[in-house]
Amino acid sequence: MVQVVENRSRVRGRVMNVAQHPTMDGYAVVDLALSDVAPVSGYANLFGHETGKVVSVNIPWGDARSHGLMPGDDLSAVVRRAGPQAVFADPASLAKG
């Protein structure tokens, strides 16, 4: 089993794709091309070397829809890595534009 240290990062990037998550009901997968990554005080920053990469971020489907997320949009959020391939956004931190 892989253990992940408690972590948070503030990211900004361009939405490349939005789709329903293939296995997690109620979630969207947003592919985000990261243009900026900043630490969140008190947490490890596991995204410090991810600038310029595309990261798949899990966002509750209702939040993705309420923000009208579409490819080409700019998005910022606080994210956490929950496993090697699992990244989740804090819905309260989502900001489009």
Listing of model-derived features with the role each one plays in the protein:
Residues 1-3, 20, 67:
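Outer-membrane beta-barrel proteins
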Residues 3-13, 49, 73:
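Short coil-to-beta-strand transition motifs
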Residues 6-38:
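Structural detector for short beta-strands of small beta-barrel domains
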Residues 11, 55-59:
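Generic detection of short hydrophobic beta-strand segments and adjacent strand-loop junctions
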Residues 19-22, 79-83:
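Short, low-complexity Ser/Thr-rich regulatory SLiMs
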Residues 26-56:
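OB-fold (S1/OB) nucleic-acid-binding surfaces
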Residues 34-37, 81-97:
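OB-fold/S1-family single-stranded nucleic acid-binding modules
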Residues 49-52, 61-77:
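Short nucleic-acid-contacting surface segments enriched for D/E, G, S/T with interspersed K/R
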